[in-house]
Amino acid sequence: MLTLDTLNVMLAVSEEGLIEEMIIALLASPQLAVFFEKFPRLKAAITDDVPRWREALRSRLKDARVPPELTEEVMCYQQSQLLSTPQFIVQLPQILDLLHRLNSPWAEQARQLVDANSTITSALHTLFLQRWRLSLIVQATTLNQQLLEEEREQLLSEVQERMTLSGQLEPILADNNTAAGRLWDMSAGQLKRGDYQLIVKYGEFLNEQPELKRLAEQLGRSREAKSIPRNDAQMETFRTMVREPATVPEQVDGLQQSDDILRLLPPELATLGITELEYEFYRRLVEKQLLTYRLHGESWREKVIERPVVHKDYDEQPRGPFIVCVDTSGSMGGFNEQCAKAFCLALMRIALAENRRCYIMLFSTEIVRYELSGPQGIEQAIRFLSQQFRGGTDLASCFRAIMERLQSREWFDADAVVISDFIAQRLPDDVTSKVKELQRVHQHRFHAVAMSAHGKPGIMRIFDHIWRFDTGMRSRLLRRWRR
């Protein structure tokens, strides 16, 4: 069967112009205009999706099939083009019957054209074919437009669903244009309103805990570039201007009490010659109580010192992926569970904004894995937030899973984050030694997010950074009171 793409080529119908008109009409629709005004960050993300829409529409037109009636009419037209005028005159009755049988829009006009001319000339033959071709072009264009209109309605419905989802999650997960673009890409999955409301719920909880949100931001920034002074720096001569009181003051600007003998007032000096007042003079001299002239003046001089040449090497700290291990034991239930999930949501927000990966592992009696920054990140986040914390604590398995992941090339610069109350058994010696080796040789960094003030120091000693967020009732009340 004839495809629409082939028909367009045969009749020289420009499908590109039709596609562009459809996309412009879609972007100018009132629904998108209101959305772009409300969420300007997502406007760029949706605009970046236009090439994908264009390619999908081309593919749809290319694969579309032409109706059998139109296919038969086109074949008849092609055969008629090959006929000479005498042959065309012989075949004309069959052609008119075929057009009538196919209910062609050209059938009635063709019969009127033939009836209006008693003799079929070469010019009439050419005119007949030209008008027939125009009729076929109109039919092909109409077919393209109908198909594109169906695609437009379907695409608009899909975009509206994704806009609803992205609009709900944008305040929670999109911190900049990069995050907005990745969020839009993730919204392509089949999600219902009730599903992503769980993310909205934990986003609202995170906003109610600004200290927790701030902790996640500090952890995310913990690999900023650092300047390191060199130890082998050479000495250099450094000259600077220093301001000092002048040895020869410029002017008298008042009186003051001091012990400056050279600037004594004459009455004070006269008391020194009176025997009865001599001791009084010395007492006031010791106490700096003598009246003296206050002189004003200052001078500048050049000071030359030797100091090391300051050169700094900037140690660019790569911001790699997050590998987050979350303790799902029974002691992490309740408020601890809410805080742990909200903290992971905050790390997901940072990962989206900085184009990083965020990989979650839940450790209990078994390990469950989620990647929150992948194409299915929203679905993965919903599954993670739906988990219940009711298992046991197996920190050793958690660390082994982290170390196995760090062996992979794509995770070599990852930051490992463990969220727990750290009320658990001590780690085996082989695990501890392996962690220290990764820290020393590969500069991997291990972060602890402690949800309790009673975590075991022996376990937490192996971490590079310990971020404390006590979830005890006293700490919660203090945080609320400070807010």
From Swiss-Prot:
Q: Which keywords has UniProt assigned to this entry?
A: Cell inner membrane, Cell membrane, Chaperone, Cytoplasm, Membrane
Q: What organism does the UniProt record list as the source?
A: Escherichia coli (strain K12)
Instruction: Identify the stretch(es) annotated as Flexible middle domain MD.
Output: 192-311
Residue ranges, annotated region (N-terminal domain NTV)? 1-191
Q: Is the keyword Kinase assigned to this protein?
A: no
Domain comment as written in the entry: A protomer can be divided into three domains: a highly alpha helical N-terminal domain (NTV), a flexible middle domain (MD) and a C-terminal VWA domain (CTV). The MD domain interacts with the triple-helical domain of RavA and increases its ATPase activity. Interacts with free FrdA through the C-terminal VWA domain. The C-terminus region also mediates interactions with phospholipids at the inner membrane.
- What happens in the null mutant? The double ravA-viaA deletion mutant shows increased persistence when grown in the presence of fumarate and kanamycin.
Task: Indicate the impact reported for residue 476 to A.
Answer: Attenuates interaction with lipids
Q: What is this protein called in UniProt?
A: Regulatory protein ViaA
Q: Which cysteines are disulphide-bonded? A: none
Record note on quaternary structure: Homodimer. Interacts with RavA. Lipid-bound ViaA is still capable of interacting with RavA. Interacts with specific subunits of the NADH:ubiquinone oxidoreductase I complex (NDH-1 or Nuo complex), particularly with NuoA and NuoF under aerobic conditions, and with the fused NuoCD under anaerobic conditions. Interacts with uncomplexed FrdA, the flavin-containing subunit of the Frd complex, in oxygen-starved cells and the interaction is modulated by RavA.
Family membership noted in the UniProt record? Belongs to the ViaA family.
**Annotated HAMAP family:** ViaA
Its localization reads: Cytoplasm; Cell inner membrane
Q: Which NCBIfam families match?
A: PRK10997.1 (NF008230)
Q: What induces it?
A: Part of the ravA-viaA operon, which is under the direct control of sigma S in aerobically grown cells. In cells grown under oxygen-limiting conditions, expression is largely dependent on the anaerobic transcriptional regulator Fnr. The operon is coexpressed with multiple anaerobic respiratory genes, many of which are regulated by Fnr.
